[in-house]
Every structure is written in structure tokens, then in C-alpha cells.
Regions:
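Repeated loop/turn-to-beta-strand initiation elements of outer-membrane beta-barrel proteins
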Residues: 23, 61-64, 131-134, 186-189, ...
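Transmembrane beta-strand segments of Gram-negative outer membrane beta-barrel proteins
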Residues: 1-38, 62-68
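Residues that define the transmembrane beta-barrel architecture of outer-membrane proteins
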Residues: 35, 44-50, 116-121, 128, ...
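Outer-membrane beta-barrel "beta-signal"
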Residues: 439-463
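Transmembrane beta-strands of outer-membrane beta-barrel pores
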Residues: 31-37, 70-74, 129-131, 140-142, ...
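Membrane-embedded beta-strand positions of outer-membrane beta-barrel proteins
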Residues: 27, 66, 136, 180, ...
Length: 463
């Protein structure tokens, strides 16, 4: 084994040394295996990933970068798909209409899944100038100060294929855009032009992590100059305080499902009202500020944003208890406050966030104030070779929790092992007002996956 490992290292070293001047590459091979230990038990993924990063420097002021991602999930090769993605609470099987073919008995629920693929994650050209930089291409831009919170950081939409359980960089959907930075003293001025308009990507229909879906009649926003997204950011450190101001004119990443109802009042004649869904994306204007200040071992940080143009789902109770759905446009404020410190050699972080809907009315399905909290702890042991971590997120209004303890073992500079558990708690959905019946139209974000707790292991080889 020692000789084999030496030959592999020698091969990679020789390959890198033989590359043309200015060409660099790096990447990793990784296996992610997850086991759901609640009935029905199953290996929910045996995902193998190959990532390759290539950079070429033409001249010191011009650099091309690409990051590709190839994956294959072996779990579907040796397990039944209906075991990997069991039926969730409030889910039902739609029988075929007359004349339609019978469903596949091996996939009677018509579960969608993506077992393999090749993705171009990032591809951009960097232009470096004395007082400015330009980045053109497919990229990820993160504006937030408080790690992990989407208050100011709303540029790239999210991939919910695996809920929010993937690494942060894997959750962001890269967009084609132009980013320009201009440096003036302690300040950086940043501008964005984003012609690539996309929304959040839901998990495949009826897959293990399926929750929200894009409605069938949804028409994406046409990609043209008029429909582009625009953003600006000013950042810098003044008087020991990190400060950020952002402004983003963008499309809502969650399409609004406008509903029109005809035939109301005909129920007594045995005629059901007809509901027509018209999913559309709406423009939002988001302006915000972020601050961070260090006081010795304690760092206080926060962000606040004012969002204009948001549409919220509404539910009116008609005579006889029937629901009439609609939408209401209301601005909202979102903020997060955080504190970070070091205690007994451990990095600790505590955050509290609120979404506040202005001019709220009782018919809006979301609470006027939504409260969220998180706690993160991390400590390096044995010179950094062992790193235990704990992340806890709670949606306070509905008493939902996500617990993520994990242990990272750095075997060498190139080989890393990771062991962890994901635990969801909470009710799968909110109750219909005045009843004990769960409302299938108001699924909870964490509680819906209360039966999907899992243990997982990752093995990663970097080069």
C-alpha cells in the first residue's frame, strides 16, 4: 500500500509539474453515504462525486476559471426507489384517469430522481486592474456578513435537492452575470448585472426531500436585458467596524401562485368551484445594511433588509368552512443578530432572526413575525486532526428543530473522513384553524421530515 500511495502521489506531482505554465488544477473525489435509521430504513444515498477545478492565467491581469461536478448515486442500483423515498404524511397517490396507462408497479408514485449527472458549477473570466476587478461568467456571489443567513445574501437561488443538508457552496445555484469591483481607499464598490434569471430549485417530485414544487403552468421569466437583475454593494472597514450596504432589484425566487376562483356559491347545487392557478414571478426591491464589530474575543454582527413587492398566500374561510385562497402584497423586514466568541478553545456562534410582515392581516397564512434561532459550536482537537461540530436550528413559532452533530477526522492533508447525524423534530404541518386536522397546504419546513433522521459518513480525497 505504501508503494502504491507513493506512485499515486508521484503521478499527480509529475502531472502538475508537466502542465503548461499558467495552468493549474485541483479537485477532489468524495463518497457520501447516508442511512435513514427510521422505518422504512434505507441507504438514502451512496453518492460519489468528482470535482475538478481548472484555472489558466494568460497574463497576470487575465485569468480563466472553471469548476465542474460529476456525480453518480449508487443507492438506486441496489434498493427499491419507493424504499429510498417513502410516502410522506399528507401525501396521496393520484389514480390514473380513464384511458391513461397504469403506473409502473416498481414506481407507482412516479417518484422523480437524478441519480447521475455532469454540472458546470462555475465558469468565469477574471480581469484585474490597478483599482478595479471584473468577473464575467457563471459564478456565485455572497453578500452576507452573518454566515448562513439569507438577509443580504439573496443573489444566487438555492438548490433544495437535499433540503438544506448539503455544504453551503453546493446549495447555491451559480448564475451567469457580470460583477465589477472598484476600490477607493477603505471602500469597495461592487456592481452586478444578472441576465440569468432563475428561482429556487425544488427537490425532485416525491423524492425523499420533496416539499415545495413549481406548478405545471409556470412560465419562467424571459431572459432579456429588460428582465435582468441588478445589484450594488458598498463595503469597507471604518473605525474598526465592518460595514456593508446593499441594494438588489431582483425576482422573487419563489413563484407566486395566483389563484382565480369561479363558481363560488354553487356548492348547494352540487357544483364544485373551479380554481385556476397562475404561477408567476414578481419583482422585489431589497435594500439592507450589515455591521460587524470585534470586542476582544467577542464579535457582534447583524444584518437588516427591507423587502418591497412580496406577495403572500392568503386563506379566507367562506360559509360552510370552505377555504378561498388568494394573495396579498405586503412589504417585509428581515433581520439577523449574531454573537461569536471563543470559549475553552471552541468557536461558538449564536444567532436570532425575524421576518416581519408589515400591515399584516389575519388572512395571510404566515405569522406576522417569524422567529428563527441557531447555535453553532466547533472545536479543533489533536492539532486540528479531530474537529467535532454541532449546528442547531429552530423555527421558534412552530417548535421545529434541526440538530446536526458531526465529527471530522483529517487523516492527512488529502484524506478526510466525516461522520454525522441529522435529526428533524416537529409536526409535519400546521393544523387547519379550529380543528385538529393537519393542513396539506401548510407543510412545516423541518417537521415534515420528522421521519427522515439519518446517519451519514463522507470520505474525501483532495488533490
Amino acid at each position: 500500500m505504501g508503494g502504491e500511495g507513493f506512485l499515486k502521489r508521484l503521478t499527480l506531482t509529475h502531472l502538475k509539474e508537466s502542465l503548461p505554465q499558467g495552468l493549474e488544477f485541483s479537485g477532489y473525489l468524495k463518497n457520501e453515504t447516508a442511512y435513514r435509521y427510521q422505518n422504512p430504513v434505507a441507504f438514502s444515498k451512496v453518492l460519489n462525486i468528482f470535482q475538478l477545478e481548472v484555472a489558466y492565467t494568460f497574463i497576470p491581469s487575465l485569468r480563466l476559471y472553471a469548476r465542474t461536478w460529476a456525480f453518480y448515486d449508487l443507492a438506486y442500483d441496489f434498493q427499491d426507489i419507493q424504499t429510498i423515498a417513502p410516502m410522506k404524511p399528507l401525501e396521496f397517490i393520484q389514480p390514473p384517469d380513464p384511458g391513461e396507462p397504469e403506473p409502473n408497479i416498481e414506481n407507482i408514485r412516479e417518484i422523480s430522481y437524478d441519480p447521475s449527472g455532469v454540472l458546470l458549477k462555475e465558469f468565469y473570466l477574471d480581469v484585474f486592474m490597478p483599482s478595479a476587478d471584473l468577473r464575467i461568467g457563471k459564478q456565485i456571489v455572497r453578500w452576507g456578513i452573518v454566515e448562513g443567513w439569507r438577509v443580504l445574501d439573496q443573489i444566487n437561488p438555492l438548490d433544495f435537492t437535499e433540503h438544506i443538508l448539503r455544504d453551503v457552496t453546493d446549495r447555491y445555484i451559480p448564475l451567469w452575470m457580470v460583477k465589477a469591483d472598484y476600490y477607493l481607499g477603505p471602500l469597495t464598490f461592487e456592481g452586478l448585472w444578472i441576465p440569468d434569471v432563475r428561482g429556487h430549485k425544488p427537490a425532485p417530485i416525491r423524492s425523499e426531500w420533496s416539499q415545495f414544487q413549481v406548478l405545471p403552468d409556470f412560465n419562467p421569466v424571459p431572459r432579456n436585458f429588460e428582465n435582468s437583475e441588478w445589484g450594488g454593494r458598498i463595503s469597507g472597514v471604518l473605525g474598526g467596524v465592518e460595514m456593508v450596504y446593499t441594494s438588489l432589484y431582483h425576482w422573487d425566487d419563489f413563484p407566486t401562485a395566483f389563484r382565480s376562483v369561479s363558481g363560488l356559491g354553487l356548492g348547494s347545487l352540487g357544483i364544485s368551484p373551479e380554481v385556476t392557478f397562475t404561477p408567476v414571478q414578481r419583482r422585489l426591491q431589497t435594500n439592507g445594511i450589515g455591521l460587524s464589530k470585534s470586542f476582544g474575543k467577542i464579535v457582534l454582527e447583524g444584518e437588516v433588509a427591507y423587502n418591497q413587492g412580496k406577495y403572500w398566500g392568503t386563506e379566507f374561510r367562506a360559509e360552510g368552512g370552505a377555504s378561498v385562497f388568494g394573495e396579498a402584497q405586503r412589504d417585509f423586514v428581515t433581520h439577523v443578530l449574531g454573537v461569536k466568541t471563543v470559549l475553552f478553545g471552541a468557536d461558538l456562534s449564536l444567532n436570532f432572526s425575524q421576518d416581519i410582515i408589515l400591515k399584516h392581516v389575519p388572512e395571510i397564512q404566515q405569522d406576522r413575525i417569524e422567529n428563527t434561532g441557531s447555535f453553532f459550536a466547533r472545536k479543533e482537537i489533536r492539532y486540528g486532526t479531530l474537529v467535532p461540530q454541532l449546528l442547531v436550528i429552530t423555527l421558534i413559532n412552530r417548535n421545529e428543530w434541526l440538530y446536526r452533530p458531526k465529527l471530522e477526522f483529517k487523516y492527512s492533508d488529502k484524506v478526510t473522513f466525516l461522520f454525522g447525524i441529522d435529526i428533524f423534530t416537529g409536526a409535519p404541518a400546521e393544523k387547519i384553524p379550529g380543528t385538529e386536522t393537519l393542513d396539506p397546504g401548510r407543510l412545516n419546513f423541518f417537521g415534515y421530515f420528522d421521519k427522515d433522521d439519518r446517519a451519514y459518513m463522507e470520505v474525501k480525497y483532495s488533490f
